[in-house]
């Protein structure tokens, strides 16, 4: 929920570059692949001066549980950003693209309702098989998504910091 001091639900004195906490909420399915993305995210953040111990890892059973946990975390006021990570694959029982769409739509609602930025690292491949070639491809791809998420988090938080710091124009 937005605070009186900031339209973004956090104290503007605590952008990520100044030590604000980031929640990384991840699904447990395909943990090794999602872990690779989270590790790449943390490494990219550390390269830019954000310590790894300021990133809280929160696990949920599957992707479907991520939005509610993200909303509960945003409501604590402890986080300047939340990153969601999952690999949503076609298990042959239901349409995985529906699950991924539902999760991403819910994550968008969380950030709009709480004004805490939420970032998606949900991969939804058309085809995924448990063999070495696919696993290696998606491990590498999730690492790329982790680095991209770090860029997005830092860019967004810097934009918010500048917006909060900008002089107000009388209406």
Where are these regions (language model features)?
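SAM-dependent methyltransferases
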Residues: 1-21, 166-171
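C-terminal binding/interaction regions
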Residues: 96-171
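Glycine-rich phosphate/diphosphate-binding loop of Rossmann-like nucleotide-binding domains
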Residues: 12-57
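Conserved active-site and cofactor/substrate-binding residues in soluble primary-metabolism enzymes
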Residues: 17, 32, 36, 40, ...
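Glycine-rich phosphate-binding loop
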Residues: 65, 69-107, 111
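Structural motif
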Residues: 23, 56, 80-82, 116-122
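Short, ordered loop/turn segments at secondary-structure junctions
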Residues: 28-29, 86-88, 122-128
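Active-site rim loops that border cofactor/substrate pockets in soluble metabolic enzymes
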Residues: 47-76
């Amino acid at each position: 929920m937005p605070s009186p001091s900031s339209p973004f639900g956090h104290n503007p004195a605590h952008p990520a570059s100044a030590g604000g906490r980031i929640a990384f909420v991840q699904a447990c399915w395909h943990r090794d692949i999602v872990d690779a993305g989270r590790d790449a995210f943390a490494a990219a953040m550390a390269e830019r001066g954000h310590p790894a111990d300021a990133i809280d890892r929160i696990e949920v059973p599957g992707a479907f549980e991520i939005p509610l946990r993200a909303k509960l975390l945003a409501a604590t006021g402890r986080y300047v950003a939340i990153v969601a990570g999952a690999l949503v694959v076609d298990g042959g029982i239901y349409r995985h693209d529906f699950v991924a769409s539902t999760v991403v739509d819910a994550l968008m609602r969380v950030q709009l309702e709480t004004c805490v930025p939420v970032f998606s690292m949900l991969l939804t491949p058309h085809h995924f098989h448990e063999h070495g070639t696919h696993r290696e491809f998606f491990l590498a791809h999730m690492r790329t998504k982790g680095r991209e998420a770090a860029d997005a988090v830092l860019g967004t938080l810097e934009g918010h910091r500048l917006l909060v710091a900008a002089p107000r124009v009388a209406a």
